[in-house]
Amino acid sequence: MKHFIEISQLSSEQIESLLQRALYFKHTKQYPSYSQSIIANLFYENSTRTRISFELAERHLAMSVVNLDLETSSETKGEAIEDTIRTLAAMGIQYFVIRHKQDGLQQNLANKLGDTVHIINAGDGTHAHPSQAILDMVTIVEQKKQLDKLKIAILGNIKHSRVANSFQCICSKLGVGELVLISPEIWQPSQVHFGRVTDNLNEGLEGADVVICLRVQKERLLQDDHLDLDFYRNNFALTQKSLSYAKPDAMVMHPGPMNRGVEIDSEVADGNQSCILQQVTNGVYARMAILESLIAS
């Protein structure tokens, strides 16, 4: 594996290998050392979970880590990201974890610079978030063994969600039994990679084994899509009542950050079925597996 850009570029065997390797790291705490590998984290969008878990993963693997401070870098002088990477590569940095608001940027960088560096996509616009898909699936397979028997529901702004895009793809690759995308009509995607779409919350959650709740982007909700916040809250929020339509042992997940009282109630987020902090924990090990796969190849 030269780069880690999209789930669609991986085989099901590669994905399964990453899942098993992540769980191995989690349960054995036996980590290889890659002290000769240098990695830079370039986050052009704000991040807490992804940025810190990538850095922890890198340090667990004994990599040399460079965190680029964009506010004090030449980016403030108008330097193109392509030139920034070329400059850092000339200093000996081989691996680049990049988050950016532009769809497809990491793939473009890999196409231009791929002979000399390794690009890891930490999220590009509304397009893809592949490491989130890996960690989410690690969390699911840790508790639910037979993916082909599962019904998984994703709830929220599917149309603008890079998390939903990557998760659809990984479900398709691994043969998940059923995937339901629950969203108000204005947030439904024009094209679905895998699964079916509904605007009926209770029907979509009926019998679900896993429920993934997406963050409501309140700034987009109010300004761009003209969807009333109270309407969303009343019809699509994950509450104790709506969760009751899922199976009693259904897993509740959320990629974070959460808007408590908007897309998810605190009673659900902090309840016995919540696996949200387990996702955060697994994010470190999933990203360790991704990095190791790149280095080993």
Swiss-Prot record:
Keywords on record: Pyrimidine biosynthesis, Transferase
Binding site for L-aspartate: 77, 162, 215
Lineage: superkingdom: Bacteria
PROSITE patterns xrefs: CARBAMOYLTRANSFERASE
Enzyme class: transferase
Cellular component aspect of the GO annotation: cytosol
Subunit structure: Heterododecamer (2C3:3R2) of six catalytic PyrB chains organized as two trimers (C3), and six regulatory PyrI chains organized as three dimers (R2).
Name of this protein: Aspartate carbamoyltransferase catalytic subunit
UniProt source species: Legionella pneumophila (strain Lens)
Lineage: Bacteria, Pseudomonadati, Pseudomonadota, Gammaproteobacteria, Legionellales
